[in-house]
Each structure stands twice: as structure tokens, then as C-alpha cells.
């Protein structure tokens, strides 16, 4: 989904509202073309690690070519199912413009996997399209308001920030 949101979001606002440090390990789940994974890469430095996960084999194949010899590891996968990532190994999971496509059972799988891979006190950041009529995007009934999102994701709610006219980011913390 990264291709969809690239250029529509205020990346500086997103990055300013995430506590990213050198040496962090970040998962860009549903990374699409990897544009945010690349931004995260520079922030975590040589001691950090970025995992870029997407079910689109073509997008991952292209991204792998682009990020050879970097701290980004791209692989095909689905964050609503168990991944090959180690338990309690991730400082930040970033999910942008993907949550609205999850079914109820996929949300359950997503929450289970997120809780498994996040370190204690680590962050989950979800960027969603606002639940209002917009000139693009999924039908309004597929979208979640911040309140609905908080009910679906049983982590500690932290920051809620507008990241463009039509998008918001909710940051959660793993207890």
C-alpha cells in the first residue's frame, strides 16, 4: 500500500511523532514500494534494522534489488499471520493505509502477531484514512475512526495526530 500513500502523507509529521532512535528495529508492515522503510533506514543508522513486509511478491522483489547492502531486509509475508520475526524483537511496527482491508479474523491475527513481536513498551503506529467522504480511497464503511481503531487494537493508546487532510496516525504502546 506504500505506493498509494506516498505523496499523500506528511512524512515529516509521521517521523516527528515516532520515537525512532539509532539501533532500533522497525517493521514496515504492508510496505508496498518501501518508501517509508527507506526513510526509517536513515534514522536507525548502521546499528538499526528495518524489516519491510508485504504480500505483493513483485513489490518485494523490486524493493530487494533497491536495498541490497543496506540495513533493510525485505520479505514476502502477511502481518495477520505468524511471521518469521523473533518474539519481542521489534521497537516499532508501522502500518500505513492497510488496516481498513483487514477482516475481523485478520484483525485478531494482526493483534496476536503484533503482541508477539513487539518489545515491551515498543510502539505500533497505524496510519488510516479518515472515516469521511474523500475523493479517493475505500468506501467509508470500510474505514475506522480513531475511536473504532482503539477498540480493535488492545494496546495502550498514546498519540493521535493528523498526518494530512485525509489521514490520521494513531500510535499505541505495547504494555
Where are these regions (language model features)?
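Conserved alpha-helix/loop element of class I SAM-dependent methyltransferases that forms part
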Residues: 5-24, 39
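A short acidic, Gly/Pro-enriched loop at the edge of an enzyme's catalytic core
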Residues: 21, 83-93
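A short SAM/SAH-binding and catalytic strip from SAM-dependent methyltransferases
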Residues: 91-105
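A short glycine-rich, Lys/Arg-flanked "PGG" loop and its adjoining helix->strand segment in the class I
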Residues: 108-120
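Core SAM-dependent methyltransferase catalytic element
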Residues: 161-175
